[in-house]
Amino acid sequence: MFNKNDYIIYGSMSVCKIIDIIEEDNVYVGRKSYYVIRPVYSDKNTIIKIPTDNKKVFMRHLLSQKEIMSIIENIPNLEIIKIENDKERSMHYKSVIKSSICEELTELIKGININEQDKLSIGKKLSKTEEDFKKAAEKLIDEEFATVLNIPVQDVQSFILDHIS
């Protein structure tokens, strides 16, 4: 259960703030409670109403500073699984983005970065698909880490690099 003014992760929308919890009558199910949320970093005019018993879209509390620092410190030790089949790799990436689990997102980013370095060494570039997945994962990581660590979103990547170097 979440409370008013909590910051949460809501699906792939990233960080949202619960601006209210309301009850409304619903023709089909009677009286029902809803979280009223607003994205923190994207369109601030967007307001979303979600049933408090929502099971369809992933929602969770933000990580703590301690949990984030632990994830950052563990980045050098992450084992990267290479998936050779493009379709399987794409499905895996979609699953990771949908889960919004920071440990998996950092693995995805690290894996794509390694793949990018390998390709650059032979004069090739990342595919548009991999670039898009990397951007989506970085957006989720950057926004959650920025909110919890109270730093600007654009400073998150350098913050991470400073702490793993």
Question: Residue ranges of each PLM-predicted region?
Answer:
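Charge/polar-rich, low-complexity and marginally structured segments
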Residues: D53-S165
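Well-ordered beta-strand positions in beta-sheet-rich domains
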Residues: V15, Y34, I47-K49
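A short macromolecule-binding patch
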Residues: R38-T52
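Absolute protein N-terminus
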Residues: M1-F2
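Short beta-strand-centered aromatic/proline hotspots
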Residues: S14-E24
